[in-house]
Regions:
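Helix-loop-helix
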Residues: 62-74, 164-178, 248-316, 320-324
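Short intracellular "coupling" helices and adjacent cytoplasmic loop segments at the cytosolic face
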Residues: 2-11, 99, 107-131, 135-137, ...
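Alpha-helical transmembrane segments of multi-pass membrane proteins
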Residues: 31-32, 79-98, 145, 149-156, ...
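An intracellular "coupling" helix at the cytosolic face of ABC transporter transmembrane type-1 domains
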Residues: 22, 27-30, 118-119, 135-144, ...
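Transmembrane helix-loop-helix hairpins at lipid-water interfaces of multipass membrane proteins
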Residues: 32-89, 166-171, 280
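Juxtamembrane loop-to-helix connectors within ABC transporter transmembrane domains
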Residues: 17, 25, 90, 94-98, ...
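Hydrophobic alpha-helical transmembrane segments of ABC transporter permease domains
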Residues: 37, 41, 45-49, 86, ...
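ABC-type nucleotide-binding domain
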Residues: 337-607
Length: 607
């Protein structure tokens, strides 16, 4: 399991950090204001109840009088009804605010992920991105909504209780209020330590989510490698680390909360110790306030601690939202061509398919050495170009640059005679068909997956695309035909079925540039024969780059490029290269012998 080093977020409690998510909170402003007003009403009732109790003791219990008791009971009944209504509405509003904030942040995170380049996905574990999208956004929404509610009630109650205590007996009020300063100092002391531990827990949680995701998605590989024990031990190490820091967090809170309770108990004891100077009614009022006063004070302390702890989540989410895409368009390009979510297709020129590399030098963002150096290549419109070479020779790099998943560090890549950076990435991708060795299908039906090639395509066009690549007969054998569910990632279909569907999807887009990245290497012989019948028709009139694993499949290519260490060492047709008896000749004959040997062994096993 890959060990991804997350960024350390060790900033102290800072409004600047929280300011970054204010745009997501502002749409819930009215809801949060309503919550605050309701909390004022709730706090007002809570402050009034001890005074009502003191009045009852003084006028009814001590003199043993029933005079006015009916009115008191009526007032209590009304207050209970009011509190019930308040609670019903603030719970409703709190849930609205929480889900509203979480949804806004979650959508923004997902949108940012859609805009980020391939390199970000290559270096960032899925678990990290999942944690940002789910757990972090949920925690922020929860704190914003319920934090405002709890904090509002606590502040209003504290202010109201202090005013009421000074109004009833100012000396006792001073005694109770004297414990606030020690409580504030304790809160400051503990919240720094809790914040530090929580940040570590957030990082470990991301690693844990990533490891779990890797274990599930790679289940088949794990089982075939008999690596269950190794994966379990690695996951156990991560959970042990999480448990260790969770225990530290529990210890901090187990000291902090009882300490706060002790301060509250001390205030109650001081009140009782001073009872000789007051009557029973006033003592009852102050005992009520002393006992309940420290609940809101503790709430405030707890909310501040939670804000400090959740700042790590805010930092991570805002860090992702500030990630820059690997490819950044110039302003003039955006003005003319639009962006992914607001394309200006009326300004798009037709793409013809002439592609030229001129003095291109390139290294990957995390690489130290150039993969390509002063690389030159011209592929004319409609050319079927096959790329072959050993692993690591630079085949996929050429394709990545053609697709503009990355851009050259020096030199330029021309499409139809112009540097492709002068036009938008979306313009290029809309004219591009890309079929991978391991195609990805989305959850949904086969029909829906093919339609991703062109979302406005009719059912007839979807089915015609399937016929072109000979996928229609395979789909017809499935129980529900085109309405068959593909499953997550296409897991309910065979590799060959997924490959055929991905071909149909690419054809439906009617691209002018076609990329086949070892697209037939993972299919069985029968499916490969179907695909080979379709490929020549698919590539006709289109500029095509085919990274080939089986060299026998590219004999009809217009030009074959043999790549080694980022340089083209041979080029020509199959016949021309075989006559040269060079690198391509060696690769082809070696592979031919291996395939022939496998065929003989297979026939012997059948016999």
């Amino acid at each position: 399991m890959a060990d991804y080093e997350d960024i350390d977020y060790n900033k102290p409690m800072s409004f600047k950090v929280w300011k970054k998510i204010i745009p997501f909170i502002l749409p819930q402003k009215k809801t949060l204001i309503k919550c605050t007003l309701l909390m004022f009403s709730v706090a007002l009732v809570d402050v009034f109840l001890p005074i009502l109790l003191g009045y009852t003791i003084k006028n009814n219990i001590v003199p043993r009088s029933a005079e006015g008791i009916g009115l008191i009971l009526t007032v209590i009944f009304v207050l209970v009804i009011v509190q019930g209504i308040n609670v019903r509405y603030f719970v409703d509003l709190g849930i609205r605010a929480e889900t509203g904030v979480s949804r806004a942040i979650r959508n923004a995170v997902f949108l940012r992920l859609q805009k980020l380049g391939i390199f970000y996905y290559n270096k960032t574990p899925v678990g990290y991105m999942m944690a940002r999208t789910n757990s972090d956004t949920s925690r922020i929404g929860d704190l914003v909504a319920w934090g405002v509610i709890d904090f509002s009630w606590s502040v209003f109650y504290c202010i109201g209780a202090i005013i009421a205590m000074f109004f009833v007996h100012w000396r006792l009020a001073f005694i109770v209020c004297a414990t606030i300063l020690p409580l504030a100092l304790l809160t400051w002391f503990f919240q720094k330590r809790i914040l530090f531990v929580n940040r570590i827990l957030r990082k470990i949680n991301s690693k844990m989510t990533g490891a779990m995701n890797e274990g599930i998605t790679g289940a088949r590989t794990v089982k075939t490698l008999v690596a269950e024990k190794q994966c379990s031990e690695e996951y156990s190490e991560i959970t042990a680390e999480y448990r260790s820091y969770a225990k530290k967090m529990a210890k901090l809170k187990s000291v902090f909360i009882p300490t706060v309770m002790f301060v509250g108990t001390a205030a109650t004891a001081l009140t009782i110790g001073s009872s000789s100077m007051v009557d029973l009614a006033i003592l009852a009022i102050f005992l009520q306030y002393a006992a309940s006063f420290f609940e809101p004070v503790h709430n405030i302390a707890n909310i501040l601690t939670e804000f400090a702890a959740t700042q790590a989540n805010v930092e991570r989410v805002s860090g992702l939202l500030q990630q820059e895409p690997g490819i950044t368009e110039k302003n003039e390009v955006l003005e003319k061509y639009g962006d992914t979510f607001s394309p200006k297709k009326e300004n798009w020129e037709p793409l013809l398919g002439d592609i030229e590399f001129k003095g291109v030098t390139f290294k990957y963002p995390d690489g130290k050495e150039n993969v390509l150096e002063n690389f030159n290549l011209h592929v004319e419109r409609g050319t079927y170009a096959a790329i072959v070479g050993e692993t690591g020779a630079g085949k996929s790099t050429l394709v990545n640059l053609v697709c503009r998943f990355f851009e050259p560090d020096a030199g330029e890549i021309l499409i139809d005679g112009r540097d492709y950076r002068e036009r938008s990435q979306l313009w290029l991708h809309s004219n591009l068909g890309y079929v991978l060795q391991n195609p990805h299908l989305f959850s949904g039906s086969i029909r829906e997956n093919i339609r991703y090639g062109r979302l406005d395509a009719s059912d007839e066009e979807v089915e015609n695309a399937a016929k072109i690549v000979h996928a229609d007969k395979v789909i017809a054998k499935l129980k529900n035909g085109y309405d068959t569910e593909s499953g997550e990632g296409g897991d309910l279909l065979s590799t060959g079925e997924k490959q055929l569907i991905s071909f149909a999807r690419a054809i439906l887009a009617n691209p002018q540039i076609f990329i086949l990245d070892e697209a037939t290497s993972s299919v069985d012989t029968e499916t490969e024969m179907l695909l080979q019948k379709a490929i020549s028709r698919l590539l006709e009139g289109r500029t095509s780059f085919v990274i080939a694993h089986r060299l026998s499949t590219i004999r009809n290519a217009d030009i074959i490029l043999v790549v080694h260490d980022g340089k083209i060492i041979e080029r020509g047709t199959h016949t021309e290269l075989m006559k040269k008896s060079g690198v391509y000749f060696d690769l082809y004959t070696r592979q031919f012998e291996e395939e022939a040997e496998e065929k003989v062994l297979g026939e012997k096993q059948k016999a």
